[in-house]
Amino acid sequence: MGRNKFLIFVTVFMTTTISATDLTVKQLQEMTARFAPVDLRVDTSKLSAGDRAALVKLIEASRVIDHIFLQQVWTGNLALEAKLRQDTSALGKARLEYFWLNRGPWSDLDEHKAFVPGVPERKPEGAAFYPEDLTRAQFEAWVKTLSKTGLGEAEGFFTVIRRDKVRGFKAVPYSEVYGTDLVKCAALLREAAKLTDNKTLRRFLETRASAFLSNDYYESDVAWMDLDAPIDITIGPYETYNDELFGYKAGYESYVNIRDDAETAKLKFFGDHMQEVEDNLPMDARHRNPKIGGLSPIRVVNEVITSGDGAHGVQTAAYNLPNDERVVHEKGSKRVMLKNVQEAKFRMTLTPISKLVLAPAALPSLSFDSFFTHILAHEMSHGIGPHQIRVSGRDTTVRQELKDLYSAIEEAKADVLGLFMLQFLQDRGYIKHDETQLYTTYLASSFRTLRFGLNEAHGKGMALQFSYMVNKGAFVYRNGLWNVELGKVRGAVRDLAHDLLTVEATGDHAGAKKMLDTLSVMRPDVAETLKRVAHVPVDIRPVFVTATELAPELR
């Protein structure tokens, strides 16, 4: 169902005039430097002895996932990695470092162009899930000849397509293609299952180990939804982004995390007050939901190690899984938020951006706690406000009525309602927060998101909010720097929340379009500001210190 990498709009580094053969050590180092190295340390002292021993096995299993994913990206990846490792020259070392950052010889930030000679100029659209010369037309013609079962296998998450002398093509299960690695990974999961004290973790690890060998992930996806343990692990084939041909095939990834109990308690507190917030939303009372449904679970964790599809390029900051529609229908989905990753992004990207865009007097009010609390409130806000609505006498949904505009409007709504919620809880005396920190951090964070550009839902939604705040006098631009007008920002937040909620509640596609056409624009003052932050690192490059200390890596 997706992941949030806080991907941001950046200038493409590699132009068509520079070939992989011509890239120098300095150029490769500059490309790598777009990712700021940062140590990730996690406190494991509160884990039981059994869980601590299990954690070591899970770190080792995570590294096996990397080996599988390299094979999924390109058939020549393992041989190329070995060749690069043997090249001890400065150029060879620079290529190897950037290879591991991208998990292959194509640069994620540069339209998947090659930075190593002797490989396809661009990453194959079908990765290694299909024959490299397969066309869409060939695949579509073949699947028309298949039975319902055969079609399910061909288009399924967990098979690769190979040529077959008799039938033209065939679907081969992951359990067969990556069998050696999956047997190794399953054994490590079973060892961890025996060591842990937690029943839900043990069940997930046992069922996921079986899934690696059977190629049937349903039972273990259900067990993952039920996982409630100090060690929070996600491991297996999930996202389909690397299948650019059809979006069918899932890449293996792993996130080994430690649950953050303090932030989890904060989420429960928010959840306990969601109905009260709903009852006071700034919109016509007839549109409020007198009984909001159960909210999808959200876990706040700290990442020990990630690998495979979750570890290349821009780092994942949150993910929402599983993708199996049967499981989603039965159990819903779960959102996992990686707090220490988000803190690292805040420190290495948002903080330096802020120093370039905020007025000096505003800088002391920049706060990670405000940043992360607003992110939590944003996620909770997706669960309140209009969802099922009635338009012209018929039952429908906000998504169906707003169509292509839904994502941008909903992202803007969640941002603004997150602010409204925190202010509401503060006014009721439920929480204490520093208003100046909240709104100053929101202003600074706007520029982090606006680096997405305006072709993506988060960027469109943020541009809408930003223009609205400027028009209301809540954000002020003086002498090339920005500040918050505290006397106006609260009212602006409430007014914008009202407008967005009303558009959603009435299914007003025309109204949504007018808002986006009018407000979701790249203002000249914003464009000028973004030019000044172009040199700030795009993202982070985690160094998994705790993982290495617990389970030293042998390469």
Residue ranges of model-derived segments:
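Short, hydrophobic/amphipathic alpha-helical patches that form generic packing surfaces
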Residues: E60-H67, E97-G104, L188-E191, T207, ...
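N-terminal secretory signal peptides that target proteins for export/translocation
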Residues: M1-R3
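Long, well-structured alpha-helical subdomains associated
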Residues: L419-K514
